[in-house]
């Protein structure tokens, strides 16, 4: 016996004594619309209707669970990829930070050397120039005295750290 559908399809319904159910495949049961299912269920006993609806619900839930698993795996892979990228960025920034700390230490050393030199020069009194050229030079100014020694001190400390 066939039950004609409003569309072009015809659903086959086997109803033989002792057989509860129809000749629907799982795929057909899951993919058919509610309207098609209701048309298919007409004329079946309540027990058969409940059984078919329960089977359909179970199959649909399996499909939903499978798609959720796929989605979860995809999201996990994406998050792991982002995590790896962020870890690389953290390592890069840590390396930059370490090199900047070294540069800062070198600059501090230069600054301290300059401060020490400035204190030394500031403490020494202005000495009048002596010797045959003294008349042309005048008194020695602390800022001009030993300017090359500052450069030497700073350069030697920087080279020692490199």
Swiss-Prot record:
Domain bZIP: 51-114
Residue segments, region Basic motif: 53-76
PTMs per UniProt: Sumoylation at Lys-14 is required for active transcriptional repression. Acetylated in erythroid cells by CREB-binding protein (CBP). Acetylation augments the DNA-binding activity of NFE2, but has no effect on binding NFE2.
Superkingdom, taxonomy of origin: Eukaryota
Region annotated Disordered, chain positions: 1-24
Residues the record lists as N6-acetyllysine modifications: 53, 60, 71, 76
Listed GO biological process terms: adult behavior; in utero embryonic development; positive regulation of gene expression; positive regulation of transcription by RNA polymerase II; regulation of cell population proliferation; regulation of epidermal cell differentiation
Leucine-zipper as annotated region, ranges: 79-93
Pfam name, any one: bZIP_Maf
Keyword DNA-binding: yes
Keywords of the record: Acetylation, DNA-binding, Isopeptide bond, Nucleus, Phosphoprotein, Repressor, Transcription, Transcription regulation, Ubl conjugation
Keyword Metal-binding appears in the UniProt entry: no
Modified residues (Phosphoserine): 124
Cross-link Glycyl lysine isopeptide (Lys-Gly) (interchain with G-Cter in SUMO) placement: 14
Covalent cross-link Glycyl lysine isopeptide (Lys-Gly) (interchain with G-Cter in SUMO2) as placed by the record, residue numbers: 14
CDD domains membership: bZIP_Maf_small
Signal sequence range: none
GO cellular component: RNA polymerase II transcription regulator complex; transcription regulator complex
A GO MF term: DNA binding
Main location: nucleus
Record note on disruption phenotype: Mice, although viable and fertile, exhibit abnormal megakaryocyte proliferation as well as age-dependent behavioral defects. Megakaryocytes display both anti-glycoprotein IIb immunoreactivity and anti-acetylcholinesterase activity.
Classification via PANTHER family: TRANSCRIPTION FACTOR MAF, TRANSCRIPTION FACTOR MAFG
Function: Since they lack a putative transactivation domain, the small Mafs behave as transcriptional repressors when they dimerize among themselves. However, they seem to serve as transcriptional activators by dimerizing with other (usually larger) basic-zipper proteins, such as NFE2, NFE2L1 and NFE2L2, and recruiting them to specific DNA-binding sites. Small Maf proteins heterodimerize with Fos and may act as competitive repressors of the NFE2L2 transcription factor. Transcription factor, component of erythroid-specific transcription factor NFE2L2.
Assembly information from the UniProt record: Homodimer or heterodimer. Homodimerization leads to transcriptional repression. Forms high affinity heterodimers with members of the CNC-bZIP family such as NFE2, NFE2L1/NRF1, NFE2L2/NRF2 and NFE2L3/NRF3. Interacts with CREBBP; the interaction leads to acetylation of the basic region of MAFG and stimulation of NFE2 transcriptional activity through increased DNA binding.
UniProt name for this protein: Transcription factor MafG
This protein's encoding gene: Mafg
């Amino acid at each position: 016996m066939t039950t004609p559908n409003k569309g072009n399809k015809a659903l086959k319904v086997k109803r033989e004594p002792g057989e509860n159910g129809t000749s629907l495949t799982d795929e057909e049961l899951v993919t058919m619309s509610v309207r098609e299912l209701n048309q298919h269920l007409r004329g079946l006993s309540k027990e058969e209707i409940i059984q078919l609806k329960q089977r359909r619900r179970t199959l649909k839930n399996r499909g939903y669970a499978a798609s959720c698993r796929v989605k979860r795996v995809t999201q996990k892979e994406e998050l792991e990829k982002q995590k790896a990228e962020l870890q690389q960025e953290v390592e890069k920034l840590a390396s930059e930070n370490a090199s900047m700390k070294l540069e800062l230490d070198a600059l501090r050393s230069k600054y301290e050397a300059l401060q020490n030199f400035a204190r030394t020069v500031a403490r020494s009194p202005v000495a009048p120039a002596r010797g045959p050229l003294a008349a042309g030079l005048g008194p020695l100014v602390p800022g001009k005295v030993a300017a090359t020694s500052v450069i030497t001190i700073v350069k030697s400390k920087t080279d020692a750290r490199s």
